[in-house]
Amino acid sequence: MSLCQGSAMQKLIAKTEGPMAGVGRVGGFNRPSGGLGQSSAEQQLQARAGERASQNRFMAVLEPQRELGGRMARGDGLQADWVRQFSSMQVEDPLAFSAEYQRAYAGYEQRQAARPAARVLGYGGSMFMPTMPQQQLQQQVAPQQTAQAALQEAELERYLEREFDVLEGELAPPEVPEALSAPLLDHEQLGFQESAKAIYATLSAPIHKDKFGASKFMGLMRQVSTGDVTLSKSESGYTGLHMTAGGEAVGAEYRAVTDEVVQVPEVAAALPLAGEERSLASQMEDLLNKVDIAGLSSNEAAMRILS
């Protein structure tokens, strides 16, 4: 046995004696001064357990876990205290709305939330809204609807006016320039036009319509009466017909015929006139009955009748 290691008798004596330097397995240590209660076996065991724990690796790992658990428990308590403090805080924002405005807005949200439920139950929802705000809303909406309706009506009128102008332009007859009418016709051409008007009016009567209605002669007389066709004037006289607008020749050139005096039958001359002159239509009817235009072209027939 070495000198550094104490015997069992020495350890027992050390427990009962006063303060003295003891020798242990690890090394010497100073015992605290005091009575028997302070140097009891329990305190020595705790001291030795602490020394062993400091030298044991596994005990060193368990101690931080115990400390962490204690810290977490203390942290939960602190967090609960922080939540209670935060919820009890009252922040005074200088830019916040007034309490009166917030109450009014809360009432507005309640009314808006009640509207869909009222429609589902079959109500219009007007009972949930006060009378004055609804009247003000109607007064504000009515002028807007009136202005919008007036604008739509004005746009519709402008559109219809443009469409009517286009239709009138398509349906209107082409305008004949004034330079192509009477001022370009001389005395003979104007007389020929007036005679053609009388002939066309006479042959358009129901009594002659079946006979001359579909003839080319009637078409020519109509064109002459409207001024679309007139006599062609040359150095040798009037030798044909042409279009007034373009100068194109109409029909074939007619041959000059000798003037013939048509003898009116005595029976026709002896008809009673009742003191009045016979109308031009009656005279033309008698003339057409006596003039033979068979085998003649439309131009020749016109010249034969008008000569």
UniProtKB/Swiss-Prot annotation:
<feature type="cross-link" description="Glycyl cysteine thioester (Cys-Gly) (interchain with G-Cter in ubiquitin)">
    <location>
        <position position="4"/>
    </location>
</feature>
<comment type="function">
    <text>Mediates peroxisomal import of proteins containing a C-terminal PTS2-type peroxisomal targeting signal via its interaction with PEX7. Interaction with PEX7 only takes place when PEX7 is associated with cargo proteins containing a PTS2 peroxisomal targeting signal. PEX7 along with PTS2-containing cargo proteins are then translocated through the PEX13-PEX14 docking complex together with PEX21.</text>
</comment>
<dbReference type="Pfam" id="PF25098">
    <property type="entry name" value="PEX18_PEX21_C"/>
</dbReference>
<keyword id="KW-0963">Cytoplasm</keyword>
<keyword id="KW-0882">Thioester bond</keyword>
<protein>
    <recommendedName>
        <fullName>Peroxisomal protein PEX21</fullName>
    </recommendedName>
</protein>
<keyword id="KW-0576">Peroxisome</keyword>
<dbReference type="GO" id="GO:0015031">
    <property type="term" value="P:protein transport"/>
</dbReference>
<comment type="similarity">
    <text>Belongs to the peroxin-21 family.</text>
</comment>
<keyword id="KW-0832">Ubl conjugation</keyword>
<keyword id="KW-0653">Protein transport</keyword>
<dbReference type="GO" id="GO:0005777">
    <property type="term" value="C:peroxisome"/>
</dbReference>
<dbReference type="GO" id="GO:0005829">
    <property type="term" value="C:cytosol"/>
</dbReference>
<comment type="subunit">
    <text>Interacts with PEX7.</text>
</comment>
<feature type="region of interest" description="Disordered">
    <location>
        <begin position="23"/>
        <end position="52"/>
    </location>
</feature>
<keyword id="KW-0813">Transport</keyword>
<dbReference type="InterPro" id="IPR056940">
    <property type="entry name" value="PEX18_PEX21_C"/>
</dbReference>
